[in-house]
Amino acid sequence: ANGRDAKTKIWGLVYRPSNFDPTMKYPVIENIYAGPHGQHVPKWFELRNRSREYAELGAIVVQIDGMGTNWRSKAFHDVCWKNLKDAGFPDRIAWMRELASRDSSVDLSRVAIFGGSAGGQNAMRAVLDYSDFYCAAAADCGCHDNRMDKIWWNEQWMGWPVDESYARNSNMEDAGKL
């Protein structure tokens, strides 16, 4: 699918239950880790795969590399500079809408998201800023305020010294939106 700019290809994977019935509607669970130091869509076989495990519970699970992740181009990656809260959400949502337009079993009225560490931060941000799309989130060990997390990691993506962009990207500052 194309991303927010309507031309950049966004890559992702879809996991369906092994007893998938194309006539049924399935909730969607996004497995997210939008840390800018890597990409999340697996490029290799994994013996143990949490996305596969959740799909077996009766959901369609997706993993998407939105803008802000690396290994594509500098412009693609720079979306996250001082903007970790973006997490590629406009691209992720466009990708899932494209999936639903091609697959009638995808129920976009039931989209949940989960992640750990930076993925936990992303999962919480999904329901803070995109609650019209994501109806539930599970955030494991999220670094919800980059002013209180390991600075060596954060200053790579947020810069130094700490400035107003840290507050703009803080889930804690926006917790009242829940």
Predicted regions and their residues:
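Serine-hydrolase catalytic core recognition
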Residues: A1-L178
